[in-house]
């Protein structure tokens, strides 16, 4: 077990992201109120851009994703670095009916993406993930995303006035603004949409998810 896996396994085992709520062990951003918009956004993007397959880089406990899995018009692969999470997801989705493939894999997502052929993934979803990872790791992920995927959905925090690094402590976190260096240098030219991804009950104007197109899968 590497250092990243140890940290995030501890977070899940100790329920450190639950913050006193009872809905999702993946944290407040995975709760029902915080995911109403992303559920509709994801289904819409899959339909509009004719997505045939997608990878969820850090699927977590599927609290909100499980709601829309039956309606996905594409194959779905959920990755997570925490083995117990993947084991639970495999068991918990056995009875979901969908004509498309639904699979899960225990792996660090950067390592997995490096094993894939170029342009082999229509859509990468990386929601509420990079905020918890060192800048160097995030940049390497972005480079791989540009190589393997046609589209990327990635969380951004518009209120952040500068990007800083994060140490791998017990609960690593800092907001990331994708439209500022060093990330803007890699991604700005490819951005095609920026969509609200905050709670439904009250608007959090800084919480968005950006859509990037690196290659077109449309004929």
Explain the meaning of each model-derived region.
Residues 1-53, 58-117, 133-219:
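Class I (Rossmann-like) S-adenosyl-L-methionine-dependent methyltransferase catalytic domain
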Residues 125:
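A conserved beta-strand element that flanks and buttresses the S-adenosyl-L-methionine
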Residues 129:
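Hydrophobic adenine-recognition pocket in adenosine-nucleotide-binding enzymes
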């Amino acid at each position: 077990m590497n250092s990243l896996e140890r940290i995030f396994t501890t977070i899940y085992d100790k329920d450190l992201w639950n913050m006193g709520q009872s809905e999702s062990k993946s944290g407040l951003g995975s709760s029902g109120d915080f995911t109403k918009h992303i559920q509709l956004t994801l289904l819409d993007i899959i339909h509009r851009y004719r997505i045939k397959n997608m990878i969820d880089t850090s699927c977590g406990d599927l609290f909100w994703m499980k709601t829309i899995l039956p309606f996905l018009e594409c194959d779905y692969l959920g990755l997570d670095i925490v083995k117990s999470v993947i084991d639970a997801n495999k068991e918990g989705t056995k009875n979901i009916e969908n004509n498309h493939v639904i699979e899960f894999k225990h792996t660090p997502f950067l390592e997995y993406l490096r094993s894939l052929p170029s342009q082999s993934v229509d859509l990468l979803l990386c929601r509420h993930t990079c905020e918890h990872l060192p800048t160097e790791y995030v940049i390497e992920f972005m480079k791989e995303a540009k190589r393997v995927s046609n589209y990327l959905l990635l969380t951004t925090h518009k209120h952040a006035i500068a990007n800083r690094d994060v140490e791998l402590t017990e609960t690593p976190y800092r907001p990331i603004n994708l439209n500022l260096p060093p990330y803007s240098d890699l991604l700005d030219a490819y951005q095609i949409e920026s969509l609200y991804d905050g709670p439904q009950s009250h608007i959090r104007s800084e919480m968005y998810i950006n859509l990037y197109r690196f290659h077109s899968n449309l004929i």
